[in-house]
Every structure is written in C-alpha cells, then in structure tokens.
A protein has these predicted regions:
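Flexible hinge/capping segments at coil-to-helix
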Residues: 127-144
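Beta->alpha turn/N-cap motifs
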Residues: 40-45, 79-84, 93-105, 121, ...
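A structural signal for short loop-to-beta-strand junctions that line the ligand-binding cleft
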Residues: 28, 60-61, 108-118, 212-216, ...
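Ligand-binding cleft/hinge of the Venus flytrap
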Residues: 65-74, 152-172, 202-207
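Short helices/loops that flank or line small-molecule/ion binding pockets
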Residues: 70-71, 79-80, 84-98, 111-113, ...
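Periplasmic-binding protein-like
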Residues: 119-127, 205-241, 262-275
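Extracytoplasmic small-molecule ligand-binding "clamshell" domains
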Residues: 25-101
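A ligand-binding cleft/hinge motif common to bilobed small-molecule-binding domains
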Residues: 102-110, 155-159, 184, 189-220
Length: 275
C-alpha cells in the first residue's frame, strides 16, 4: 500500500509540475508557437507607415516588424491601426506588439509595456507659404490643429491654451492625413509634425504646392518605443535586445537611409542617461 501511495503522490506531483510548466508559457512563447506576429502599425504616417500603389503596407515601422518576425521565425501580420487605437488594440489582444511610433510617456507606461527607444523624432511647423509663418512663435493667435492622441498634439494644444489668445484656436483630427490636408486646404494655418512627416508630405506631391516647413518646434526629442502587454516581461526583454541588435548590426541605419534619406540616423539615447 505504501508503495502504491508513493507512486500515486509521485504521479500527482509530476502532473502538477507539467501543469506549472505549461502555465509558465508567456506571450513570447505563444507568438513563436502560433507562427505569427500580429504587429500594429499606423499606415497614414509616412515614411514610418503607409500603403504603396498596390495597397501593401510599407515603411520603416513595417520593415521593423518584418525584421522582428524574421528573427522570431514567424510570419508577420501587419495590422493597420490609428494613433488613438494603438494601445486599445494591444490591451484587447487584437495585436501582439505595436510598432506605431509611440512616444514613451509615463502615462502610457501605466497601461502598456515599452521597449527602449527604436526611433527618435524632431518636430517642425508645417504650414503654407501664403500664411507667412516662419517660426513657432508665429502660431500665437492662429487657427492650428493636430492629430488626436499624438505627442505633438498634446504639446501644441497645451501651448494654445497657455497663449490665451482669443484669435487662436486648436482643432483635433482623427488621422495624420486629415491634419495635413487641413493645412493644405487652409482650414488651419499650421500644425506641428515630425520632420520626417513634413518632408515626406511636401515631397509626395499630394498636397498644395505652397506647403512648407515654417521652422522648428521647441519640443524635446520624441523618443518612441515598441509596445507589448505591460506584464509580459519576457517579450519586453526580447524587444529591448532586438532594438539593440538592429543598431549594432547597422540595420537601423540601413532602414533610416531607405525610408528617411541620407544623413546620420538619430541617436536613441538621452545624452548621459542609460535607458
């Protein structure tokens, strides 16, 4: 009887351990086992994300997702997402990660896990030549606007309120394309966008020929992160190493040249700070 009891206990323990091992699998394991990486990308934010003439997703963020899927040994699935829906798509499990040029704010970090920065943006004023705007200070008392849920929208609206000029106003738009179109059509006098977006928009030929950069915006460098579920530390650690490898292998510089242009790719660290 004792031998049978010991055998029963051993079998139960083995089953318990097996169950614990199975339950210990995390998001990274699940992605690899599924054979697919669902990656959210904002596809109206060239050159980071857009669609080509055949409606295929293209851009820096798209290539970044493809690179990540390749090293994971899975197939990439690009999920077109708006700026406002990046984190909701993640927390509702519609995507596995977000490569949507998402600013690494402390507020967002309450909801989503963030990698070390994989890209960094500087901001400029986008306007039309006939609006006679040559610097950021010229936006005081002007109708301006920006894309909802973006870093630059929050900063610009805050300044409009601080200026407290009765002639000034701020409008929100659902997409980046809507914001740029509003500037192009004269619905607003200016907006603030990344330098990459500004030059890509002017170069595209899709908008009014008077579209131009009206100086730099005095915003801090916008460091952006890959997003993963907040408690999935195994996946977040993997993303951190992946970003580091992209830089060390020269792939980051290669993608920058391909999608943005010649010149040095932005540094991904605050000087004197170890992220």
């Amino acid at each position: 009887m004792k031998m049978k009891t010991l055998a029963t206990v051993a079998a139960a323990a083995a089953l318990l351990c097996a169950g614990q091992i199975a339950s210990a699998k995390d998001k990274l394991d699940n992605i690899i086992e599924s054979g697919k990486l669902r990656c959210a990308v904002v596809l109206d934010f060239p050159p980071m994300g857009s669609r080509d003439a055949s409606n295929n997703p293209v851009g820096f963020d798209v290539d970044y997702c493809n690179d990540l899927a390749k090293v994971l040994g899975v197939k990439p699935e690009i999920v077109g997402t708006s700026f406002a829906d990046r984190i909701p798509a993640l927390v509702s499990n519609r995507v596995d990660i977000v490569a949507g040029s998402t600013s690494d704010t402390l507020e967002r970090a309450k909801t989503a896990g963030m990698s070390i920065p994989y890209f960094a943006f500087t901001m400029v004023v986008l306007t039309r030549d006939d609006k006679k705007i040559t610097n950021y200070a010229d936006l005081k008392g002007r109708p301006v606007g920006n894309t909802v849920s973006t870093f630059e929208a929050i900063a610009l609206e805050k300044d409009v309120k601080a200026w407290n000029n009765k002639k000034g106003s701020f409008l929100s738009f659902p997409t980046q394309a809507d914001t740029i179109q509003a500037v192009s059509q004269g619905k607003i006098d200016a907006t603030v966008v990344t330098s990459t977006v500004a030059f890509a928009s002017i170069k595209s030929g899709k908008y009014d020929k008077r579209l131009k950069v009206g100086g730099n915006a005095p915003y801090p460098i916008d460091y952006v992160s890959l997003l993963a579920p907040r408690t999935e530390y195994g996946l977040i650690n993997y993303l951190n190493l992946f970003v580091s490898q992209q830089v060390r292998t020269g792939r980051y510089a290669e993608l920058y040249k391909k999608w943005v242009g010649d010149g040095k790719a932005p540094d991904l660290m605050v000087p004197g700070v170890y992220y």
